[in-house]
């Protein structure tokens, strides 16, 4: 796996799924391919994106700044600085300085990542802030190691929280989660269907599923009534894709 592929993988792992994630993935690909070369326009776009947490925006802003060539005196962005200040905690700043000194001795991406993984997310963010504010310099490779370590920690905590939701025994939460997943799957089917003749069938299945979820929410139904809803939808989607000659078996 190339360095930039690895960075893209880690950064996207902390972005919530949805159309915005696809948009960010495209921007990252363009930036890494040297296509998107106006840093100011890119940062303005990032600043106004909804849904993303300030820290995620800060990390993305840091990655864009590392990758897109810019004029020497280009102003640093406040929204990135605020996100990478370790919540203003002096302990985070102290640890960030210690980490920075260790990173100065590293020359490889993996070496930097290993060193960084033993620090808290707050200290890692503060260390990124030091580098972003030009208070310290490291090689791009080392900076990317720091980024990936931070993303790994965030993704770990997101995974724990997601696992808690998936394994919850509360039937109401499970019921709602199944309906949300069915609804988003239906939306994806509608987007993928396009305008071919066979698309009408997929659109019909998706539309019925969304109507069913809407009705279930409106009248209130037994928590077990949503069981299998998303799986049925996915089977329909896969059958449709097979007829279209597309193989995407890994949706479930």
From Swiss-Prot:
Q: Which SUPFAM superfamilies match?
A: Influenza virus matrix protein M1
Residue numbers spanned by region RNP-binding: 165-252
Q: Pfam families, alphabetically? A: Flu_M1 (PF00598), Flu_M1_C (PF08289)
- Kindly list the GO CC terms recorded for this protein: host cell nucleus; membrane; virion membrane
Q: Where in the cell is it found?
A: Virion membrane; Host nucleus
Q: Where is this region: Membrane-binding?
A: 1-164
Example of a GO MF term: structural constituent of virion
Keywords of this entry: Host nucleus, Membrane, RNA-binding, Viral matrix protein, Virion
GO-annotated biological processes? viral budding from plasma membrane
Motif (Nuclear localization signal) on chain:
101-105
Topology of this chain in the membrane: Peripheral membrane protein
Family stated for the protein in its record: Belongs to the influenza viruses Matrix protein M1 family.
> Which miscellaneous remark does the UniProt record hold?
Most abundant protein in virion. When expressed alone can form virus-like particles in transfected cells.
Subunit structure comment from the entry: Homodimer and homomultimer. Interacts with NEP. Binds ribonucleocapsid by both interacting with genomic RNA and NP protein. May interact with HA and NA. Cannot bind NP without genomic RNA.
| Functional summary from the UniProt entry | Plays critical roles in virus replication, from virus entry and uncoating to assembly and budding of the virus particle. M1 binding to ribonucleocapsids (RNPs) in nucleus seems to inhibit viral transcription. Interaction of viral NEP with M1-RNP is thought to promote nuclear export of the complex, which is targeted to the virion assembly site at the apical plasma membrane in polarized epithelial cells. Interactions with NA and HA may bring M1, a non-raft-associated protein, into lipid rafts. Forms a continuous shell on the inner side of the lipid bilayer in virion, where it binds the RNP.
Q: What is this protein called?
A: Matrix protein 1
State the organism of origin: Influenza A virus (strain A/Chicken/Pennsylvania/1370/1983 H5N2)
In the UniProt record, the gene name given for this protein reads: M
């Amino acid at each position: 796996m190339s360095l930039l592929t690895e960075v893209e993988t880690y950064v996207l792992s902390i972005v919530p799924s949805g159309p915005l994630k696809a948009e960010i993935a495209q921007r990252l690909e363009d930036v890494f391919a040297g296509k998107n070369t106006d840093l100011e326009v890119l940062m303005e776009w990032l600043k106004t994106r909804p849904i993303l947490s300030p820290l995620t925006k800060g990390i993305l802003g840091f990655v864009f700044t590392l990758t897109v060539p810019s004029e020497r005196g280009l102003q640093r962005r406040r929204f990135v600085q605020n996100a990478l200040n370790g919540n203003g905690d002096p302990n985070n700043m102290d640890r960030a300085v210690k980490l920075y000194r260790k990173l100065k001795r590293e020359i490889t991406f993996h070496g930097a990542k290993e060193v960084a993984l033993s620090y808290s997310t707050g200290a890692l963010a503060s260390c990124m802030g030091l580098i972003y504010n030009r208070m310290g310099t490291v090689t791009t490779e080392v900076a990317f190691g720091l980024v990936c370590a931070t993303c790994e920690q965030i993704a770990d905590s997101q995974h724990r929280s997601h696992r808690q939701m998936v394994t919850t025994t509360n039937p109401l939460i499970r019921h709602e989660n199944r309906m949300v997943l069915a609804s988003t799957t239906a939306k994806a089917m509608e987007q993928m269907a396009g305008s071919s003749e066979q698309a009408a069938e997929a659109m019909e299945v998706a539309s019925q599923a969304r109507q069913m979820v809407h009705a279930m929410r409106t009248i209130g139904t037994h928590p077990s009534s949503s069981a299998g809803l998303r799986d049925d939808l996915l089977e329909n989607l896969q059958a449709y894709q097979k007829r279209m000659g597309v193989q995407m078996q890994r949706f479930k």
